[in-house]
């Protein structure tokens, strides 16, 4: 558990840590995940600190979903995919946030319950190169502007 003074996402929302922002509103910001599942993987993060998604006030939850819905067609266009996935985890950082992921493969977002062979070893996704993040952010912002 963390508080807003040390929370990574709170610090990003306050502008203390740089990010590749693609959209923002009074309640939330959207920026690229630096360890993306796929290029264009966006995090939608409330500006206010909430440890769990079920703690979100209704207006904040609505805004997070509104931004995710706004991003989906922009990601389909800018990343050249047919489907965009949306999920909440709250596993790595104790600050409620949504993942909006351009899906290249149906298994880009899955559950271990569907895995036929075990054991599996999981580790963090590799850091995306800064240039790739900059290019993706520019493409997504462009697609948002064209919407």
Name the predicted role of every residue range:
Residues 1-147:
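HIT superfamily nucleotide-processing domains
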